[in-house]
């Protein structure tokens, strides 16, 4: 069919407008749901301020800490994990073929001795060279194994884990003393909960001592400051809104808790994806729903884990490209979840939404800007029509970011200094006018890399000294 050029312009204009209206409309709905969930969480949080009294019914937890060339930070990470406020847990460090002396540092710091453990290798991994146990901390073990990537290291940790719950922790994560208690509560309250994720915030600009957060602050540089706003929106709204529907597809690998048996039955973490954390969650949805087994995957909105954000464009670009590749791989490997007969809201709502707006979103957004601006410059589009498009594409995005910031201020209120709110408002503006478009471009590159690129297992960002908040 040979449509006139003007008809193609009209079609393109309507398509991009409808796309962005649908995108922002769904996010608005998720926002409204999230507000209710946060309100309920805040009432429970008030009870948590009372002195901790453990009932003795708490399920013991295995903390898995995969490490590859983490010599500079591994001791602080392990020390902080050993000081968590929880009745019974073990810490398992998995040294994944490090070449920088990580194992030797652990041996000296924690008096490691060979441990003749009998491990059930229910999940296939690269060869385990040795297992050590600390003479000073009986609940600390270290697995030394050949390099196989983060997912392979986590599988080795699951094989050695003694407890029914396990929690993967990144080596650069900063926890709070009650982080385990908050994340494990849903597992204790509901036996059908098989996975729980927590809200992740950025440690850039915060004061950290002994591996624990002492004071919350904002980073002084613009790039990580923008990411603070981005994380607020992503965790407070982008994920929490799916929980009442049992349709949460992402639990951050930075700090997530799982029941061990369903994960082992599902085959553990896949080693052929850079998004092993999301892929496992989507696969659990697919397997549990297909088997018609009752299950829930939940989210704890409390800020219980703090991680370092990239402070340079090169590291941030690499991170976002990996995330987009991981998203594409997770959806592709579990495509049978889409519109499955028993898939529920995860397969009928969250999965198609993620394909349309998260996976293909960068392509449509970049294409929309290019199409509408080109049509305007060529005289096919009025300035009024262009402004309407920009308002829908950018104005609603600005509103959503502002609502995330507002919810943070009304609930957790972590950023207390007078200058913090103006700084966050500035970052909110910059995020939507420049950063968002650059991020979409990186994500588009990541999508193309999934189609044509090579594998990459361990993703690294350039580490900085822990920044201190300004006085």
Predicted regions and their residues:
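N-terminal membrane-anchoring/stem segments of glycan-assembly enzymes
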Residues: 1-57, 239, 368-374, 402-407, ...
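Long helical/loop segments within the catalytic core of UDP-sugar-dependent glycosyltransferases
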Residues: 26, 115-155, 159, 163, ...
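Membrane-embedded multi-pass helical conduit in multi-pass membrane proteins
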Residues: 53, 353-451
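Cell-envelope/extracellular polymer assembly enzymes that use nucleotide-activated donors
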Residues: 59-62, 90, 264, 279
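Acidic donor-binding segment of Leloir-type glycosyltransferases
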Residues: 79-143
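Short aromatic/hydrophobic "clamp" motif used to bind/position activated sugar donors
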Residues: 166
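A short, conserved alpha-helix in the catalytic core of glycosyltransferases
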Residues: 262-265, 273-298
């Amino acid at each position: 069919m040979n449509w006139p050029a003007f008809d193609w312009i009209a079609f393109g204009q309507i398509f991009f407008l409808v796309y962005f209206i649908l995108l922002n409309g769904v996010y608005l709905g998720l926002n409204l749901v999230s507000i209710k969930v946060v309100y309920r969480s805040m009432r429970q949080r008030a009870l948590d301020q009372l002195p901790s009294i453990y009932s003795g019914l708490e399920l013991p937890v295995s903390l898995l800490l995969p490490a590859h060339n983490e010599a500079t930070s591994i001791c602080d990470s392990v020390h902080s994990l050993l000081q968590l406020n929880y009745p019974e847990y073990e810490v398992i460090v998995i040294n994944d073929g490090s070449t920088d002396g990580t194992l030797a540092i652990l041996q000296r710091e924690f008096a490691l001795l060979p441990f003749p453990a009998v491990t059930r290798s229910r999940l296939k991994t690269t060869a385990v060279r040795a297992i050590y146990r600390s003479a000073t901390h009986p609940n600390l073990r270290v697995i030394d194994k050949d390099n196989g990537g983060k997912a392979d290291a986590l599988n080795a940790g699951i094989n050695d884990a003694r407890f029914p719950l396990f929690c993967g922790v990144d080596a650069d994560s900063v926890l709070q003393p009650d982080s385990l208690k908050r994340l494990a509560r849903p597992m204790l309250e509901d036996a059908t909960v098989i996975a729980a994720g927590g809200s992740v915030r950025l440690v850039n600009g915060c004061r950290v001592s002994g591996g624990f957060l002492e004071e919350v602050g904002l980073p002084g540089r613009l790039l990580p400051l923008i990411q603070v706003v981005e994380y607020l929106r992503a965790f407070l709204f982008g994920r929490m809104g799916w929980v009442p529907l049992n349709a949460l597809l992402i639990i951050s690998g930075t700090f997530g808790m799982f029941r061990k048996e369903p994960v082992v039955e599902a085959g553990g973490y896949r080693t052929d994806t850079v998004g092993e954390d999301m892929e496992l969650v989507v696969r659990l949805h697919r397997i549990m729903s297909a088997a018609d087994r009752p299950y829930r995957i939940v989210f704890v909105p409390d800020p219980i884990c703090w991680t370092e954000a990239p402070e340079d464009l090169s590291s941030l670009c690499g991170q976002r490209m990996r995330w987009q590749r991981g998203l594409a791989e997770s959806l592709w490997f579990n495509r049978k979840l889409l519109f499955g007969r028993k898939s529920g809201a995860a397969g009928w709502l969250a999965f198609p939404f993620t394909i349309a707006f998260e996976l293909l979103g960068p392509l449509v957004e970049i294409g929309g800007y290019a199409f509408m601006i080109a049509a305007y410059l060529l005289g096919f589009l009025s300035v009024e029509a262009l402004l309407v498009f920009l308002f829908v594409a950018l104005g609603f995005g600005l509103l959503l970011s502002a609502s995330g910031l507002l919810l943070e201020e009304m609930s957790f209120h972590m950023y207390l200094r007078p200058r913090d709110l103006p700084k966050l408002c500035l970052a909110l503006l910059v995020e939507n006018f420049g950063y968002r478009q650059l991020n979409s471009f990186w994500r588009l590159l990541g999508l193309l890399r999934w189609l044509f690129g090579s594998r990459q297992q361990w993703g690294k960002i350039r580490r900085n000294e822990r920044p201190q908040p300004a006085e």
